[in-house]
Amino acid sequence: MGFAGLLPVTLDRQNTEMTRLRITSCGLTFIAETNPDAPQTVAAFLKLLPYTQKIIHVRWSGEGCWVPLGEFKLENDGVAVGFENHTSHPSVGDILFYPGGYSETEIIMAYGSCLFASKMGQLAGNHFLTIVEGKEKLRELGVKVLWEGAQDITFEKI
């Protein structure tokens, strides 16, 4: 199969309007916009809102925080979300959804240099949200989670 499975797919951009979300954690507030290049991930995630979980510091990926989701399957009309607009190199403020497979399902948010990985090796996640306001506070969040442990994080539509 080689790299054929990694070739770009045709995107369904019927609704490319970006939705804004408020993300709160550790007393900090961030505003994120959905990414039109990940329509299936965005549509399925928006159905979960408001969404609260625990966020912890990454173990293998560098400067990032993640929401471990175990065997959870993000679904869109009963179909599990697969890979779309996926990357291993999130920029500061990028939020990725990893649908599982080699490692557990998760959401990862970069606050500094980050290469998305697990003990199994490099991973790629769907870039579905980008923080557009409050990005300068991400390092504060990351350091707090690193030194103080798991924190609540909430995603809600504005």
Model regions and ranges:
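N-terminal intrinsically disordered, low-complexity, charge/repeat-rich segments that act as generic
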Residues: L11-D37
